[in-house]
């Protein structure tokens, strides 16, 4: 079943290539120049060529026929090709019969065949050929009525029966007329088939559009026709024919420089029409996809195909080629100018492929450096690919400077190559830092700061390169030749590579600066608070020997919280906005008014603030406290969840000017010690 599906896929593509070939030929065929040549030749008196408009209509009929062949379903397309093959076989049988009759007329021998060796050889050859033609026709048409295709055997039978040669000529004509009538009958019997197919196709298209819409219809046709593979195969066939035509007309093999020129000119010849240009676009897309797939396989092996990234499909390179070709009018240029411009466009495509390779390799290399993988082969593959991406773009920029005169387009290519090399250099430096930290026994302090400075350095260099490109483009526009395309490229380059990069870098700097200020403004937890908290950092899941306390009373490592604040301004646990909660404090360990104390639940503080404050150094305070305590004991109220768990204490409350008795209160203290003065409360533990 898999083999059958593959064969059907190959047939689906291969049988549609002639339709695009026909479109290519019709586009290249200049009808007006064709009729001018006919008028200057002897064919001008031919009545067929007197009706020029009929030929023009046939030209448009060819377009319709090619579109029908392109969109016809595979089953009907196979049947159509079988019918065409049968017609060609019948024509071959007619040619064999005509050649045999001419040979017999030239010899003039009318006697028995076995007496003349030459006549016997001609007869045997013609008989074998006609039998093969009849057999193939019956097999192709899947019928056992082989006599339908054996009309051209009549001249052979007549010659075997010693019929005169003049009569054999008429018999051959009768065989030709009989075969032609068969073909006409077959065409007439299937005359309504195209109409029925068009009617069915229209009804299905209307149903699909009503249910799913035009977009779904376009996607369905795209998948059924396999247009990218179809245009790629068409362009490869066209390119192979161009190379074959060149080498078939040359006796000596070309030199190395000539081969490069031949390669560029052949590509330029094969993109002179919109159809061949689309074929080149899809071919470049598939080549880019193959290169990126090999890059993934080289880095990760078969694991790369498990988590395939939809972003690296090679479509970016193909779309880049198409946009540049359309904007520069590539198909309207001469072959030499087209080859020169195409070389520059291909350099841009190669630079885009290198950038995509870097996007694939960068996270893999950094993850490999941060992990503890000891496989030398993995590290060798990652580092070797990075070294290639470091050296090759620089070499390509050097070659461009050597062979081309500098202009804005070439400066964009060179800047892209330099940026790729800079990014690879930054990736390698970070990888080296990770490996140094791995081999050291103690971790490197402020490693994130070092990595940030490395990234910031090459980002700054990228920004400077982009600014230089924009400055050169503006100067060339002001003092050189002004074009709409050049100005558009400058604006797009200025927005994406200058303004957005500057804005992103400035935002990153502000986030880091605000994070440092926030960490400095937060109180530091004391040793007692850390012991009472007795928890790990929720970011790194490690024990805390030192920590800072957020306004929402959560404990974190200062370094971990700073890294978190580099990205967002919320608490990692409660996701509250730290920016709005931060307020200036009087001292690092003292909570301000409205701010909960360290290691204290905000809900408890809020409930305490709602309750009236009670003075305990008066008789009313003691009575209120006793009433509150007795009420809590009767109702069985527990402490609020999240309050501090302290050891039970036995307190003697002594009030001045009263004869109150001592009450032994055993249990958890509801209030902190700060709420009761030491002169009024004596606690005996």
UniProtKB/Swiss-Prot annotation:
- Name the Gene Ontology biological process terms: ERAD pathway; hemopoiesis; myeloid cell development; proteasome-mediated ubiquitin-dependent protein catabolic process
* Source taxonomy: Eukaryota, Metazoa, Chordata, Craniata, Vertebrata
**SUPFAM superfamilies, from UniProt?**
RING/U-box
- Name of the protein this chain belongs to: RING finger protein 145
Keyword check for Protease, yes or no: no
Q: In which compartments does the protein localize? A: Membrane
Provide the primary localization.
membrane
Q: Which organism is it from?
A: Danio rerio (Zebrafish)
Q: Where is the composition biased (Basic and acidic residues)?
A: 620-631
Q: Which keywords label this protein? A: Membrane, Metal-binding, Transmembrane, Transmembrane helix, Zinc, Zinc-finger
Q: Which gene encodes it?
A: rnf145
- In this chain, composition skew of type Low complexity spans 583-602
Q: Name one GO cellular component term.
A: membrane
What transmembrane ranges does the database entry give? 53-73, 77-97, 123-143, 151-171, 174-194, 225-245, 275-295, 316-336, 340-360, 384-404, 410-430, 460-480, 482-502
**Superkingdom in the source lineage:** Eukaryota
Give residue ranges of zinc fingers (RING-type). 537-575
User: Mind telling me which InterPro entries this protein's record contains?
Assistant: HRD1_E3_ubiq-ligases, RNF145_RING-H2, TRC8_N_dom, Znf_RING, Znf_RING-CH, Znf_RING/FYVE/PHD
A Pfam family that this protein carries is zf-RING_2
